């Protein structure tokens, strides 16, 4: 492993005003990581003065320039220090390859899921952690704006109801817990993973770390090439965010890539293998049924889900029902033993706007709702995956149908992409649809990169995809009435009007790019960020804000 490729902390990565801070819990000995931005002046908002802004931070130790980190050793197992006695866990099997820790599993017949404890009325350390994290140390501000801060009890209630999930496998002690649900901050997921045509373990670990640093709340390893197990191990041991996978991909590799040779036994063993490593959620395509295949195969673009196409091939070859459906209860029994959440895959999502909202898509959605209830009976956490390609005016129906059929389980969508002609710019295309559906209640957006439909993304593509979808999620949070999201914009506006460039850089979603663009343009004028009372878009003589200030100062 090349340590230099691991995105190790660099001084002032987020800017000189940014630092990593922690907030202590009151129920458990937890320390919740956040980022604090010091401002160059004090700004007034609703009668309150702010000389700093605490920010939600997904970067973990990688965002702390004061700490050294060696990816060859992995992150510290912070959850192991919280002292929560699950009481029903035992160690099994051999040692994990990087850490020497033995995998843990619930004793026979027991459950260790967040939903299980929530339904018993127990607030776990993870629940307290996400409550503190969602508030961003701004409880007083939230109340001043007429809102209610998130409490551990509220988190417990939402998880017990199934309206939110905390993906946190008991074998992934390195993560900083987060929550996915419509009553919380909108989250984003970044997909990484090798293919048969390229990428290495080093590159995928770096992309995972890079995703966390720029704002991805979860990461999915969708590797389909060589060294799937080893790649996943390196990613898990170095990930402060939950990791998801599609176990079907590795199961397919085990049978030489031949879908017809897949079996429940191969798939079951793959689930256990990945659960023991620490994967936090699985995408499982249990909703594609033999009866729905004719509708899907008659579409303009057929079945565009990789997992969906694999299981369709298996069903056709064996003339049997999808074993991910028929063995669903067995799947849940495995997952409840490790607290792996299920992301019910949309195997029949539309791959073109002409196929949006058709019988195949919504037929599968109804099946996913039925499976949700079956998973909940076993205290397994569930979220529902959604489309896909959907024109803007048809997006609202997707959210309404999901709420109707899936019992308010969190919705997790790929976009939606609102047009089919944006190749090279599909990250923007996805963010347009994502902003709308998130404002309507979607809990998490899966990012799309500029390489979508074209090729395997590199590190720079990952950054671009994460930031663009972070913009979409933030815009949706504002539309939903988030007081913390609104405050960040309020402070940015005041900094902009005051020509406080350093504060603008610090408050931006991409401080590095913001600073670079301004520095490149202002250098030609002879001014600096410290002195310029204008930007090069308008220049010193045509700056509207500068003129407005001069007019006000003159009493005109």
UniProtKB/Swiss-Prot annotation:
Any one GO cellular component localisation term in the record: cytosol
Binding site for Zn(2+): 389, 453
InterPro entries in the cross-refs: ThiC, ThiC-associated_dom, ThiC/Bza_core_dom, ThiC/BzaA/B
UniProt-annotated binding residues for [4Fe-4S] cluster: 535, 538, 543
Pathway involvement of the protein, from the record: Cofactor biosynthesis; thiamine diphosphate biosynthesis
Function: Catalyzes the synthesis of the hydroxymethylpyrimidine phosphate (HMP-P) moiety of thiamine from aminoimidazole ribotide (AIR) in a radical S-adenosyl-L-methionine (SAM)-dependent reaction.
Its EC number(s): 4.1.99.17
EC top class named in words: lyase
Cofactor note: Binds 1 [4Fe-4S] cluster per subunit. The cluster is coordinated with 3 cysteines and an exchangeable S-adenosyl-L-methionine.
Gene Ontology molecular-function annotations: 4 iron, 4 sulfur cluster binding; carbon-carbon lyase activity; zinc ion binding
Cofactor requirement: [4Fe-4S] cluster
Family as reported in the entry's similarity comment: Belongs to the ThiC family.
Residues annotated as signal peptide: none
The reaction(s) this protein catalyses: 5-amino-1-(5-phospho-beta-D-ribosyl)imidazole + S-adenosyl-L-methionine = 4-amino-2-methyl-5-(phosphooxymethyl)pyrimidine + CO + 5'-deoxyadenosine + formate + L-methionine + 3 H(+)
Residues where substrate binds: 191, 220, 249, 285, 305-307, 346-349, 385, 412
Keywords: 4Fe-4S, Iron, Iron-sulfur, Lyase, Metal-binding, S-adenosyl-L-methionine, Thiamine biosynthesis, Zinc
Protein name as it appears in the record: Phosphomethylpyrimidine synthase
Gene Ontology biological process terms in this record: thiamine biosynthetic process; thiamine diphosphate biosynthetic process
């Amino acid at each position: 492993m090349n340590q230099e490729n691991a995105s190790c902390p660099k001084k002032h990565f987020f800017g000189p005003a940014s630092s990593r801070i922690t907030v202590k819990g009151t129920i458990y000995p937890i320390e919740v990581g956040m980022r604090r931005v010091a401002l160059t002046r004090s700004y007034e908002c609703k009668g309150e003065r702010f000389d700093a802004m605490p920010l939600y931070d997904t970067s973990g130790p990688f965002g702390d320039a004061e700490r050294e980190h060696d990816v060859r050793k992995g992150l510290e197992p912070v959850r192991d220090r919280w002292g929560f006695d699950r009481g029903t866990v035992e160690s099994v099997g051999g040692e994990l390859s990087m850490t020497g820790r033995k995998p843990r599993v619930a004793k026979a017949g027991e459950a260790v899921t967040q939903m299980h404890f929530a339904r018993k009325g127990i607030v776990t350390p993870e629940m307290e952690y996400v409550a503190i994290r969602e508030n961003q140390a701004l409880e007083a501000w939230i109340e001043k704006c007429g809102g209610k801060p998130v409490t551990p009890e509220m988190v417990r209630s939402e998880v017990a109801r199934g309206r939110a999930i905390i993906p946190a496998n008991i074998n992934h002690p390195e993560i900083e817990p987060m929550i996915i649900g419509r009553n919380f901050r909108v989250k984003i997921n970044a997909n990484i993973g090798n293919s048969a045509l390229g990428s290495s373990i080093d590159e995928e670990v770096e992309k995972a770390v890079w995703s966390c640093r720029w704002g991805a709340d979860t990461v999915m390893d969708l590797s389909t090439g060589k060294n799937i197990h080893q790649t996943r191990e390196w990613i898990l041991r170095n990930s402060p965010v939950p990791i998801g996978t599609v176990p079907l991909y590795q199961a397919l590799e085990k049978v030489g890539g031949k879908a017809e040779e897949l079996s429940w036994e191969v798939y079951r063993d793959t689930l256990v293998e990945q659960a023991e490593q620490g994967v936090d959620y699985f995408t499982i395509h249990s909703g594609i049924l033999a009866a729905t295949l004719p509708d899907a195969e008659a579409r303009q673009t057929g079945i565009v889900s990789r997992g969906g196409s694999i299981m369709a091939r298996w069903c056709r070859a064996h003339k049997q029902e999808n074993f991910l459906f028929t063995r669903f209860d067995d799947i849940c029994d495995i997952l409840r033993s490790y607290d792996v959440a299920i992301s019910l895959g949309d195997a029949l999502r539309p791959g073109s706007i002409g196929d949006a909202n058709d019988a195949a898509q919504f037929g599968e959605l109804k099946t996913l709702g039925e499976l949700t209830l079956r998973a909940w009976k076993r205290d397994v956490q569930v979220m529902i995956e959604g489309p896909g390609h959907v024109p803007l005016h048809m997006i609202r129906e997707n959210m309404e149908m999901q709420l109707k059929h899936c019992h308010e389980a969190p919705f997790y969508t790929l976009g939606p992409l609102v047009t089919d002609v944006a190749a090279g710019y599909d990250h923007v295309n996805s963010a347009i649809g994502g902003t709308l559906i998130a404002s309507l209640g979607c809990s998490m957006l899966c990012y799309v990169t500029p390489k979508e439909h074209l090729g395997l993304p590199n590190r720079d593509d990952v950054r671009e995809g994460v930031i663009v979808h972070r913009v979409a999620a933030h815009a949706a949070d504002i539309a939903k009435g988030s007081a913390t999201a609104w405050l960040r914009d309020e402070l940015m506006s005041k900094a902009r009007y005051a020509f406080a460039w350093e504060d603008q850089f610090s408050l931006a979603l991409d401080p590095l790019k913001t600073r670079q663009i301004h520095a490149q343009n202002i250098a030609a004028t002879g001014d600096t960020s410290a002195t310029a009372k204008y930007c090069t878009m308008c220049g010193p003589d045509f700056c509207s804000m500068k003129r407005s200030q001069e007019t006000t100062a003159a009493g005109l």
